[in-house]
From Swiss-Prot:
Keyword flag Transcription: yes
Localisation per UniProt entry: Cytoplasm, Nucleoid
CDD domains (alphabetical): MraZ_C, MraZ_N
One GO BP: negative regulation of DNA-templated transcription initiation
InterPro entries given in the database record: MraZ, MraZ_C, MraZ_dom, MraZ_N, MraZ_sf, SpoVT-AbrB_dom, SpoVT-AbrB_sf
Organism: Shewanella sp. (strain MR-7)
Domain SpoVT-AbrB span(s) in chain numbering: 5-52, 81-124
Protein name: Transcriptional regulator MraZ
Keyword flag Coiled coil: no
């Protein structure tokens, strides 16, 4: 399980170093193989260990190619999907189309989301956090069916 936010840098070759605390689980449980694709609702990237991505692919396989919305979803997620592997220094290469999609520059945030990571431009991440806080403050959480029994 991946949790926490880490500030990392994108090098001049388009690589990022995965924080040390995640490298061993990624190597041992997933042979260092990661699939990167786009988030369809935000300007960020999603990084899935290969096994987790294969579960997504199984769901995508069940979608219709004749339904415009379902086909569009498949095109976005699969069309941008790139499989990468951790190198000996725990780095992965972010392909240029993915870097462009998420407007990634030098300063990046890697955010654990349990079974995957999100990869954000640092300024976009800070703005997203502000928006999340505003949403949480403005919504009546108890009226949200899925959150009604959620407690910290």
């Amino acid at each position: 399980m991946f949790r926490g936010a880490s500030a990392i840098n994108l090098d001049t070759k388009g690589r990022i170093a995965i924080p040390v605390r995640y490298r061993e689980p990624l190597q041992l449980e997933h042979q260092g193989r990661i699939v990167i694709t786009v988030d369809i609702q935000s300007a960020c990237l999603l990084l899935y260990p290969l096994h987790e991505w294969e579960l997504i692919e199984a769901k995508l396989l069940k979608l219709s190619d004749t339904d415009k919305t379902q086909r569009s979803l498949k095109r976005m997620l699969l069309g941008y999907a790139h499989e990468v592997e951790l190198d000996g220094n725990g780095r992965i290469l972010l392909p240029p189309p993915l870097r462009q999609y998420a407007n990634l520059d030098k300063r990046i945030m890697l955010v654990g989301q349990l079974n995957k990571f999100e990869l954000w431009d640092e300024q976009a991440w800070l703005q997203q956090i502000d928006e999340c806080q505003e949403t949480i403050r403005s919504e009546e959480l108890a009226n949200n069916e899925r959150l009604a029994d959620f407690s910290l």
